[in-house]
Amino acid sequence: MSNIDKERAIAAALAQIEKSYGKGSVMKLGQRPNVDIEAISTGSLGLDIALGIGGVPKGRIIEIFGPESSGKTTLTLHLIAESQKKGGTCAFIDAEHALDPAYAKKLGVNIDELIISQPDTGEQALEIADTLIRSGGIDMIIIDSVAALVPKSEIEGEMGDAQMASQARLMSQALRKLTASINRTNCITVFINQIRMKIGVMFGSPETTTGGNALKFYASVRIDIRRIGSIKDKEEVIGSQTKVKVVKNKVSPPFKTADFDIMYGSGISKEGEIIDLGVKLEIIEKSGSWFSYNKIRIGQGRENVKQYLKEHPQISNEIEKIIREKSSAITNINLDQTEE
């Protein structure tokens, strides 16, 4: 078959597919109107940089997992707030029945516009999620959490009944159904997950996430979040030092990490990240306990500098912009070196 005949055959096949399944069902990748992946900020400057595209990708499945009280829900509430700032409509499937509206409001979530559901069973939760995603009007949906998606058979059964892998089967079936709708509607779907210990593991990490392996495969981004220390004001604990690791990333190089502070009552400390990343990238100068920007001293001690940046948002925004530009340039250089 000559090249002309091949092209005619392909064109005829594409025309037949489009006639059967609609325009846009098949095309050459270069013809796609939006090749670049859009992203929504996580609310953490360091994590946005670690993810490589400035946030979590639209139209993808995201898994956020970690131990108890590590900041999983806080991070997802920041995601909702950032999406709402850009005019997005968000939904929260609260399978754990533990969402605190007052805390969400403090983190910048518009609770009047947030769609919330507190389902009774795992099937109900995932059906609600499917209906909302298929509507095409939802920009982000949070499912909190996979561990709380209890199958109907388990709820209706006796307390001691063995329900072997029923949750894993439920998740596998749901993700097969959801994944095409998520991509088509460009909806960010975030699953919060918990950690369990595998029994009898001799080598490697005994930690695993709940709900089987399906979510590990379907997720484009998997974020491991851990509390690594406390932030104290004299004797009072006022926050947590948090470390996140991007353990899977289909849209950028994985295994990058970010550290940030989660302050009780106000969430991720943007100012703390600006100081740490500013010093690391030599945008902010540190001499002893003094910090300087553009040769002007902006404070002594990290907490005082944080307060200064809160009171001077124009300087804070200026430093943040430089950090994002510098980090983007460094990422591009690293990618070019990898390709060589």
Curated annotation (Swiss-Prot):
GO cellular component, one term: cytosol
Binding-site list for ATP: G66, P67, E68, S69, S70, G71, K72, T73
Gene Ontology biological-process annotations: DNA recombination; DNA repair; SOS response
Gene Ontology molecular-function annotations: ATP binding; ATP hydrolysis activity; ATP-dependent DNA damage sensor activity; damaged DNA binding; single-stranded DNA binding
PROSITE patterns in the cross-refs: RECA_1, RECA_2, RECA_3
Keywords from the named record: ATP-binding, Cytoplasm, DNA damage, DNA recombination, DNA repair, DNA-binding, Nucleotide-binding, SOS response
Keyword Methyltransferase on entry: no
Localization (cell): Cytoplasm
Predominant subcellular localization, coarse grouping: cytoplasm
Coiled coil start-end: none
Family: Belongs to the RecA family.
Protein name: Protein RecA
Organism: Rickettsia prowazekii (strain Madrid E)
Phylogenetic placement of the source organism: Bacteria, Pseudomonadati, Pseudomonadota, Alphaproteobacteria, Rickettsiales
